Amino acid sequence: MKNILVYSILLLSITSCNKNNKKTIILSKASENYVNWIDRRDIIIIDAYNISNTDSILNLADGIILTGGEDIFPLMYNDTNNIKLCGEFDFRRDTLEKNLFDYAFNNKIPFIGVCRGMQMMNVASGGTLYGDLPTEIGDSILHRNNGEVMHDIIVTNNNIDNISMIFPVNGKFSPKKYFFNVNSWHHQGLKLIAEDIIVIAESYDGLPEAVVINTNVHPFMIGVQFHPERLGKYHPIHLNMRDKFFEQIFK
């Protein structure tokens, strides 16, 4: 976390000095796991949540990651019924992450949404969310249980280019025969899927677990409901998502 604090404090220096071919990744709200996931000598990490004027950092972004966190305020997707089902809100963060998504989308910046970040990806694109999964779709699959749980997800898309942005797949691929065991810690999820968002994988209750934006619209916008940053540094999904993200950033 030390590097993030330094970069936040010295933002004026970053904007005025040559970055020496380093690339800048903006995290919507940083934590140690996210920093460790993407930390490299040629990467500058900025914690947007600790910047008072986020407009001042947008043009620095070579990549943007929306991280996990609180529930998104339901009025952002025109839902008043969900308010009573939600936990805590962070209105400033809602606005910040909507702005970061819009900037990434409009400027073709490589983008990852994790957990809440994938939900914001859908909401910002015009989709909606389930307010509380056990209440609305049942508890056949536990998505959290006093903390993080593990469960299987199944790849449901057959476009190998889309799938490989997130999952480590090689050679001949058969949809609905590819399973991954992932971590889970959420009580909300994607309901109405926004236009241009393609579901790549689902849990057994049909909840979207991985998505991409149509590559005809944006070259690299991906989202996952699970937490790749906490899967372990040698986990194939942890590595694949990071490497594909870096490939786009360093093109």
Where are the language model's segments positioned?
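N-terminal beta1-alpha1 cap of cysteine-dependent amidohydrolase-like domains
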Residues: 2-5, 15-114, 122-130, 134-181, ...
